[in-house]
Amino acid sequence: MGCGASKVDKEGQARNDAIDAQLKKDRLAQKNEIKMLLLGAGESGKSTILKQMKLINHGSYSAEERESYKEIIFSNTVQSMRVLLDAMERLDIPLADATNAPRAEIILGLSPSIESSVLPRQVADAIHALWGDAGVQACFGRSREYQLNDSAKYYFDSIQRMAEPSYLPTDQDVLRSRVKTTGITETHFKIGELNYKLFDVGGQRSERKKWIHCFENVTAIIFLVAISEYDQLLYEDENVNRMQEALTLFDSICNSRWFVKTSIILFLNKIDLFKQKLPISPMADYFSDYTGGADYNSASEYIVNRFVSLNQSDAKTIYTHFTCATDTSQIKFVMSAVNDIIIQVNLRDCGLL
């Protein structure tokens, strides 16, 4: 009897030890699992950041993946030229070269969605000729007055390469492609010992009510702002300045009861376009209290202060980074800095800092 009881006790202890070991392993895994929300207004660059995470952590795109982006890239390019041509009519800007009129008709007669693995040479030649037209260039110079994708110039400049029968999109081609995000997407990647789950939600106003599902147990928020859009209007409401919308959204997220102590990492994105735009579109025209002229340092400091000053909580830290989401090496450096921030946040939450 005694020996039998002893055997049962040993088996029970072994099971308990196994359960304890598994619980310890689960706690350790949970500690190393980081949930982050990727937030920001529409077209701020969130999807591009997610593509960069794939490039940085999983390597370059496969040939099959590149092939799958061709229709998106072709459609983005054609849609952008259609937007330009429509804007020319609305703004009463004529083509400088009348012989380009039939080429404009070719583009306007196309479906907005190109369902082909090869860009027709006639379409590519039409876009190439139109992009060289002084009237089209004049309209492009007024792109803040209508809704044009940031990638338009890049794709127009690359149109002959894209029309080659052997064309396969480069990483940069893929990074600049645009598909509206709807619903919630989840991206997994690892930096050092930490396993990240990064949730991207639709940035357009109609998508925001869906964010609530991502809120629980979030370690930190990455909030993206396209600082180059200080002179542009919303896609959904052309009476609202995009930067003002971003400020309003940041205020609501930063001071939400869901995020009282949640650290926010602010990515001030599209600095390349911002630098190009400052000398030709005075920021003071849109923010009357700005007095720094076209100086990049003054303008960027002003925008940082506008966002950071909205924070009403002493318990919350806001970390800022200036980014160009299409620059892989820069995003790799910034994400390394983000990882350091997350480690500090983890240590703080565990009472070790």
Curated annotation (Swiss-Prot):
Residues with lipid group (S-palmitoyl cysteine): C3
GO terms, biological process: G protein-coupled receptor signaling pathway; pheromone-dependent signal transduction involved in conjugation with cellular fusion
Region named G5 motif: 323-328
Domain G-alpha: 32-353
Pfam families: G-alpha
Protein biosynthesis is among the record's keywords: no
Binding site for Mg(2+): S47, T181
Annotated residues for binding of GTP: E43, S44, G45, K46, S47, T48, D150, L175, T181, G203, N269, K270, D272, A325
Region (G3 motif): 196-205
Cofactor(s) in the UniProt record: Mg(2+)
Molecular function (Gene Ontology), one example: G protein-coupled receptor binding
Lipidation (N-myristoyl glycine): G2
UniProt GO cellular component terms: cytoplasm; heterotrimeric G-protein complex
UniProt KW keywords: GTP-binding, Hydrolase, Lipoprotein, Magnesium, Metal-binding, Myristate, Nucleotide-binding, Palmitate, Transducer
Record region (G1 motif): 35-48
InterPro entries, sorted: Fungi_Gprotein_alpha (IPR002975), Gprotein_alpha_su (IPR001019), GproteinA_insert (IPR011025), P-loop_NTPase (IPR027417)
Function: Guanine nucleotide-binding proteins (G proteins) are involved as modulators or transducers in various transmembrane signaling systems.
Family membership noted in the UniProt record: Belongs to the G-alpha family.
Protein name: Guanine nucleotide-binding protein alpha-1 subunit
Gene name for this UniProt entry: GPA1
